[in-house]
Amino acid sequence: MATRNALRIVSRRFSSGKVLSEEERAAENVFIKKMEQEKLQKLARQGPGEQAAGSASEAKVAGATASASAESGPKVSEDKNRNYAVVAGVVAIVGSIGWYLKAGGKKQPEVQE
């Protein structure tokens, strides 16, 4: 039943571009809160050791809903590879912008025979 409601809401929202009525918005909010509550209860039933070994999606939901807790630390990535990828991306973007700006002033004369 819940999946049918979720499918109906998603299909209505994305198919016609129609703005949801107040009833539909309220039903969607209730559904979302219920799903979040169920996930929190599921995490609470698991032990603290099992919670750390849980899936990444559960951890994201727990982190998103418990963002006000004192347990959450600074949001700094500790993954070396990801940090290197971010730095490489920034360097590539800055380099491409510099290359574009440097080449923008040069106009090659057309050779006509």
Swiss-Prot record:
Localization annotation: Mitochondrion
An annotated GO cellular component: respiratory chain complex I
Organism for this UniProt entry: Arabidopsis thaliana (Mouse-ear cress)
PANTHER family: OS08G0559000 PROTEIN
Ranges that cross the membrane: none
Annotated stretches, region: Disordered: 41-79
Designated name of the protein: Uncharacterized protein At2g27730, mitochondrial
MF term (GO), any: copper ion binding
Keywords: Mitochondrion, Transit peptide
